[in-house]
Regions:
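Bacterial N-terminal signal peptides
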Residues: 28-39
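Substrate-binding cleft and catalytic face of glycoside hydrolase catalytic domains
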Residues: 69, 75-95, 102-225, 235
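Carbohydrate-binding surface patches
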Residues: 360-396, 403-404
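C-terminal beta-strand-rich structural cap/linker in extracellular carbohydrate-active enzymes
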Residues: 411-433
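Noncatalytic carbohydrate-binding groove/subsite architecture in carbohydrate-active enzymes
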Residues: 179-293, 302
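Aromatic/acidic polysaccharide-binding cleft in carbohydrate-active enzymes
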Residues: 279-342
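Boundary/entry segment of secreted carbohydrate-active catalytic domains
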Residues: 46-78, 83-85
């Protein structure tokens, strides 16, 4: 928190104005000074509100692909999540090559397109550590210095600074995950990030799935004192709606450990569905698109301010490799059905916020009431087989938009409208006078 408050800024401005002449030049200078003071006072850029599509994002694996960024922006995504790899930046002790490693170009490209960034500060560095982890005091100091240098270089852009990726599994923290060493790393790194970038937010621990006992032990070691938001990766073979009970349990756990007066938001930092599901079942492109739209909608309903879909595009073309089929686009950046579903959701409900879930009589049927000013919309779908439901739209003309953007005009003369509901979300927009 800056000691210079907005009230102090107003007092300073008043003194400047009283001592200056009333020339146009002086007024302009005063205006610029006042703006700079207020900018300094604002502090961290907040998490986005729960308005479509302000918190929608995708994971990426590139540093300088302008055409990909154009497609991402065109789909309505407002965030990207990307590794800011320690070993790529610091190849010689104490020398940070952000430009040569491509991060300057990526940051500039995102900023130009109005895309916010979640940078994952990861992984280890052979200059200091022998494995994919940070276990020594020397390594922690070096990692914290690298992180602070990154925050200083890209300060002022409201970046979410994430400390490591999935430290709770052996793949990313070797030889074995260590709550003790991970929490020590966060404690060593977070203060420097906040000092170097007052507009940024520190987020962690980016866990694989939602490991409640692991999180409980981290919270017990003080993790929530050092971070601004909690990131988890709610992967599951089941449909997205099953996350509701997990978020409820996680919130209760957070509330039992959060410092008094501190609000810790949950961020869905990585979550997607490959065409080869976790239980080895196969999904069609349409099912993947359905799950994408439903994931974003469920996260909004659950007050999750940032939702990152994994992945922007396929990481390869092997038909039997799960990792090659998470994308909203193919390996050569050709849009898949998931991309069209994301673009339709973002454009159709742009500016809308979820107000409540409507009761359709079955737990498997979902209908979310959304609002944008005086405009109303209902997003509705089911987790089971197609059937008909009755929606409370009232006498009105409306537009019904499909998962992929096909629209039909409807006229309802009664209080309710009966429509087919399927596993593909549809958007019913009531026309206003």
């Amino acid at each position: 928190m800056n000691n210079l408050t907005t009230k102090n800024a107003l007092n300073i401005m008043s003194e400047i104005s009283q001592s200056a002449t009333k020339s146009c030049y002086t007024l302009l200078v005063n205006y610029l000074i006042f703006g700079a003071i207020l900018l300094f006072c604002t502090g961290a850029k907040p998490l986005p509100d729960l308005t479509v599509p302000n918190g929608f994002g995708v994971n990426i694996h590139f540093r300088d692909e302008p055409k990909d960024l154009d497609l991402i922006a065109d789909a309505g995504f407002k965030f990207i999540r990307m590794d800011l790899t320690w070993s790529a930046v610091e190849r010689k002790k104490g020398v940070y090559e952000f430009d040569k490693s491509g991060y300057d170009a990526l940051t500039k490209g995102c900023t130009k397109r109005g895309i916010r960034i979640l940078y994952i500060l990861d992984y280890s560095n052979r200059l200091y550590e022998s494995d994919r982890s940070v276990l020594t005091e020397q390594g922690r100091r070096a990692f914290a210095a690298f992180a602070k240098a990154a925050a200083a270089r890209y300060a002022g852009k409201g970046i979410l600074w994430e400390i490591w990726n999935e430290p709770n599994i052996k793949q990313f923290w070797r030889p074995q995950p260590s709550i003790e060493h991970y929490c020590k790393l966060v404690e060593a790194t977070a203060p420097g990030l906040k000092e170097a970038d007052s507009t940024g937010l520190v987020v962690a621990p980016a866990t694989s799935t939602i490991p409640f006992q692991w999180l409980n032990d981290c919270f017990n070691r003080g993790l929530l004192k050092w971070i601004d938001a909690l990131t988890v990766h709610p992967y599951r073979p089941q449909h997205p709606e099953t996350v509701i009970k997990d978020y409820d349990k996680l919130r209760k756990l957070i509330n039992s450990y959060a410092p008094q007066g501190k609000k810790i938001h949950i961020i869905s930092g990585e979550w997607g569905y490959s065409l080869i599901n976790w239980d080895k079942s196969r999904l069609s492109e349409q099912q993947q698109a359905q799950y994408l739209a439903r994931m974003f909608l469920m996260n909004l309903y659950q007050n999750i301010p940032v939702s990152i879909w994994y992945d922007w595009k396929d990481d390869g073309s092997n038909p039997n490799e799960r990792e090659h089929h998470f994308g909203t686009a193919t390996y050569d950046a050709k849009p898949k059905q998931a991309y069209l579903a994301a673009k339709t959701l973002s454009s159709t409900l742009n500016g809308y916020t979820v107000q409540k879930r409507l009761d359709l009589g079955k737990q498997s049927d979902f209908a979310l009431m959304l609002q944008s000013g005086k405009k109303e919309a209902i997003a509705f779908w089911t987790t089971l087989q197609e059937h008909k439901v009755t929606l409370p739209i009232g006498p009105a003309n409306a537009t019904l938009c499909s998962l992929f953007g096909n629209k039909i005009q409807l006229s309802c003369k009664n209080e309710e409208l009966k429509l087919p509901i399927s596993q593909s979300p549809q958007y019913l927009l009531r026309k206003t006078e």
